[in-house]
Amino acid sequence: MKIVFMGTPDIAVPCLQKIIDENYEILGVVTQPDKPKGRGKKLGMSPVKELAIENNIPVYQPVKARDKEFIDKIKSLNPDVIVVVAFGQILPKEILEIPKLGCINVHVSLLPKYRGAAPINWVIINGEEKTGVTTMYMDEGLDTGDMILKTEVNLDENITAGELHDKMMNIGAETLKETLRLIEEGNAPREVQNHEEFSYAPIMNKSLGNIDFSKSAREIHNLVRGVNPWPSAYTTYNDVIMKVWKTKVLDEKSTKDVGTIIDVSKDGIKVSTIDNVLLIEEIQMPNKKRMLVGEYIKGNTIETGLVLG
């Protein structure tokens, strides 16, 4: 089976590696153009491009996937399947219609829930107890195509978006492997999504990390996990931005105004919310590294009675 692979960030790398390991004929890899990276702003390759070059696979980097020249190139390759994993551009109908056996997408949610750009973050922010990977046949909509396979994953109440991202990379690759096997055999299932049950996972932005202490301790805990490592949760302490990296919901209440620092100890900062007390265990002050509160207070003071935010 001849495959064209389209993907860009590190979450797509295990999927490409799995296709290489399974000895499919890879006609080419399509990835986003090189971008300036680091302080020197030198052009850097995407993780997918690096893997392709290591394996002597031709690489294509269209600025726009709808350009006629690029579409003609993919047509000339004549793939049986196009596999898309976090490519970063919307594919036009002309490309979706090229492969004989379809364009296959690996999406890191249990569709139709959490369509869109940031499902890993939003399942945690919303306090979901499970998520998963869905493979599907692509159509012109945003993650609306017919589903092939699903793999469910239970969510620990303390898992962060970064940890879940790393977990899903490998689960996605295994689900893709099974999907491609079924497609090659002609046995791939095809299930229409229930479009009435959909939800969206919009792209993340920095303001999402701003903690609102008038919410429940559990909601704040979920936010802190869901925006870790990016865009990261934050509040203000004495008019200075304080990033919040790790929290715990305590089985105790407070009558203080929301956001009030109730107590500071080696265990962390106790803060009042609309219901339970939230323990902030790890913070980061401007121009400093991340630190457990117990370490930070050895050389710095955090005052009780002050209100965060």
From Swiss-Prot:
Catalytic activity field: L-methionyl-tRNA(fMet) + (6R)-10-formyltetrahydrofolate = N-formyl-L-methionyl-tRNA(fMet) + (6S)-5,6,7,8-tetrahydrofolate + H(+)
A Pfam family per the record: Formyl_trans_C
EC class of the enzyme, as a word: transferase
GO CC terms in record: cytosol
InterPro entries the UniProt entry points to: Fmt (IPR005794), Formyl_trans_C (IPR005793), Formyl_transf_N (IPR002376), Formyl_transf_N_sf (IPR036477), Formyl_transferase-like_C_sf (IPR011034), GART_AS (IPR001555), Met-tRNA-FMT_C (IPR044135), Met-tRNA-FMT_N (IPR041711)
Top-level lineage group: Bacteria
Keywords, alphabetical: Protein biosynthesis, Transferase
GO molecular function: methionyl-tRNA formyltransferase activity
EC numbers: 2.1.2.9
Residues noted as binding (6S)-5,6,7,8-tetrahydrofolate in the record, renumbered to the chain: S109, L110, L111, P112
Family matches, as PANTHER family: METHIONYL-TRNA FORMYLTRANSFERASE (PTHR11138), METHIONYL-TRNA FORMYLTRANSFERASE, MITOCHONDRIAL (PTHR11138:SF5)
The family this protein is said to belong to: Belongs to the Fmt family.
Main function: Attaches a formyl group to the free amino group of methionyl-tRNA(fMet). The formyl group appears to play a dual role in the initiator identity of N-formylmethionyl-tRNA by promoting its recognition by IF2 and preventing the misappropriation of this tRNA by the elongation apparatus.
Name this protein carries in UniProt: Methionyl-tRNA formyltransferase
Lineage summary: Bacteria, Bacillati, Bacillota, Clostridia, Peptostreptococcales
